[in-house]
Amino acid sequence: MSRLGIMVLTLLLLVFIVTSHQDAGEKQATQRDAINFRWRRSLIRRTATEECEEYCEDEEKTCCGLEDGEPVCATTCLG
């Protein structure tokens, strides 16, 4: 094989290695963003649940969750 052929193959191999490395980095960043989103979402949900529990505690009832952003309190939660 000529020198030019070897150089072209080497260049193609380098391009392949660089692009696959970039793809792996982007995938890792996407996974990290997804984990951060889940963590923030659970934190928001936990805060809302705590507020609901405090609100219903004043009425001596159980917090059954939020409906349209408002706490739903009842003596017994169904479903």
From Swiss-Prot:
The presence of a 'disulfide through disulfide knot' structurally defines this protein as a knottin. The cysteine framework is VI/VII (C-C-CC-C-C). GO terms for molecular function: ion channel inhibitor activity; toxin activity. Residues 1-20 form the signal peptide. Keywords: Amidation, Cleavage on pair of basic residues, Disulfide bond, Knottin, Neurotoxin, Secreted, Signal, Toxin. Pfam families: Conotoxin. It comes from Conus pennaceus (Feathered cone). It comes from the Eukaryota. It is found in: Secreted. Its main location: secreted. InterPro entries: Conotoxin. GO terms for cellular component: extracellular region. Residues 21-44 form a propeptide. Belongs to the conotoxin O3 superfamily. This is Conotoxin PnMSGL-03. The modification Leucine amide is found at L78.
